[in-house]
Regions:
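Selective transmembrane helix interface/packing segments
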Residues: 2-283
């Protein structure tokens, strides 16, 4: 007798975890309200009003970093010649970054040199991205500009450092005054090179990651909030629509996992490409 009530309560709780944002528009009529940009600016619950205030998104970032550190510690604390499952998984993922990103973008020699930076960046971006599909967290640490911007600045510093270390101050000359261009054309070419190399690279790195994570979050919240609304608020025949919204939400969750991985790959690979371009004497 009580089983259907219990199952309904559990389903409602599960959907609440998947769509933790309000689906009531506040008018009291139970109307549906979709996801909002307000989701990305939650109120602080610790140290409010100080430079160190902590809100929900900051907590998600702390959790992502802590879990990442814990997984690597557990997988590498007892390294063996014949690796266990944890060590094998870490070796496989690190090997993926080494062969497909570091070596692929920079070659073996330079790839080995910049591998620590690129691996750290890849796993950091992926860990921050994937929190968007974790029930109870439900938002990516990279869906607010802070982390994407910091990572883009790191990439920016890395390729400028690589260029100066390799070429000295000639790096700026070769970047702004490409060889083979008629001198008169430098009036046009140099401003374009300056914008594309020193301004647009960090901006596009930041915005590409940020916009993808925002869009993914909005669609997931829309799907699961709509499911909750159709099933528990609208009722009647509208409950049938919840089947479609739930199915689409689950499919899109898998898609978002792939997006999280792809964006980590793209961000890190482009960082490697920018470093490689800085190492070339004339480009």
């Amino acid at each position: 007798m009580h089983a259907p009530i219990l199952e309904t309560a559990l389903l409602h709780h599960a959907l609440t975890l998947l769509a933790p944002f309000a689906t009531d528009d506040g008018s009291g009529d139970g109307g549906f309200t979709g996801p909002s940009l307000v989701d990305f600016f939650p109120q602080a619950f610790l140290f409010e009003g100080t430079p160190f205030e902590i809100n929900r998104i900051m907590m998600v970032r702390f959790i992502a970093v802590a879990v990442l550190i814990l997984l690597f510690w557990l997988g590498t604390r007892r390294m063996r010649m014949i690796p266990g499952r944890g060590q094998s998984l870490i070796e496989m993922t690190v090997g993926f970054v080494q062969s497909n990103i570091a070596d692929g973008a920079l070659g073996k020699e330079e790839g080995k040199r910049y591998m620590p930076l690129l691996a750290t960046m890849f796993f950091m971006v992926f860990a921050m991205n994937v929190t968007g599909i974790v029930p109870g967290l439900n938002i990516s640490g990279t869906s607010v500009i802070g982390v994407p911007l910091v990572l883009a600045v790191v990439a920016y510093i890395a390729f400028i450092y690589a260029g100066i270390k390799k070429q000295g101050m000639n790096f700026f000359k070769s970047s702004l005054f490409p060889a083979g261009v008629p001198p008169l054309l430098y009036i046009v070419v140099t401003p374009i090179e300056f914008l594309s190399t020193f301004i647009l690279r960090p901006v596009t790195l930041t915005l590409r990651l940020l916009m993808n994570m925002i869009a993914g979050h909005m669609l997931l919240v829309l799907c699961f909030s709509a499911t909750q609304f159709f099933l528990f608020t609208a009722g009647g025949l509208f409950g049938l629509f919840s089947i479609g919204t739930l199915a689409f939400g689950l499919i899109f969750t898998i898609f978002e996992l792939l997006v999280a991985l792809l964006q980590a790959y793209v961000f890190t690979y482009l960082t490697g490409v920018y470093i490689q371009l800085a190492l070339v004497e004339e480009h």
